[in-house]
Amino acid sequence: MLLSDRDLAAEIKAGTLALEPFDPALVQPSSIDVRLDKLFRVFNNHLYTHIDPSRQQDDLTSTVEVPAGEPFVLHPGEFVLASTLEVISLGDQLAGRLEGKSSLGRLGLLTHSTAGFIDPGFSGHVTLELSNVANLPIMLWPGMKIGQLCIFRLSSPAEYPYGSAVYGSRYQGQRGPTPSRSWQSWHTWPTR
């Protein structure tokens, strides 16, 4: 069940949903607006001929910190990692979905490629996968609204929430845009 503004406020008051820093003015009818942090991860395209998710490629990306009062310029066709300004923490009976803002989508900004789901028990900055599909550069200002967080109540609390040892949660407590850690649990299944 998708939570309404009243339910979101109740979960925040109960401590089962937390955003830090939190601004009550960002609560919408069925979501909470989240803002863009000042850290970005850019791809070092000149260092690799390809990306291999089964291997550790530590220098595939580099962190860029945008100076105060300046934007990050995302050029047409570019893809970068960024993160929410807010640290988001979900209880074991809540899951989240991060969606883009309609106003930004109409300018050609995609907020996430595929990873918009947030598991129950997660706590940390949410990594954003930003793409510019427009024909002009897009100025990204730290602190601007970048997405909206929708919260869903599970039918029962998760038996093993994100962060428990069972799943080897690789991104729990992440600070800033975190590069892929797919290689840490790489596995392929037989094909026919």
Swiss-Prot record:
Record GO biological process: dUMP biosynthetic process; dUTP biosynthetic process; nucleobase-containing small molecule interconversion
Pathway it works in: Pyrimidine metabolism; dUMP biosynthesis; dUMP from dCTP: step 1/1
Quaternary structure note: Homotrimer.
Assigned protein family: Belongs to the dCTP deaminase family.
A GO molecular-function descriptor: dCTP deaminase activity
Protein name per UniProt: dCTP deaminase, dUMP-forming
Binding-site residues for dCTP, renumbered to this chain: K101, S102, S103, L104, G105, R106, D119, T127, L128, E129, Q148, Y162, Q174
Site entry: Important for bifunctional activity: G116, F117
Chemical reaction(s) catalysed: dCTP + 2 H2O = dUMP + NH4(+) + diphosphate
One Pfam family, short name: DCD
Record keyword Plastid present: no
Organism: Salinispora arenicola (strain CNS-205)
CDD domains: trimeric_dUTPase
Region of interest called Disordered, as start-end residue ranges on this chain: 171-192
Entry EC number(s): 3.5.4.30
Keyword terms of this UniProt record: Hydrolase, Nucleotide metabolism, Nucleotide-binding
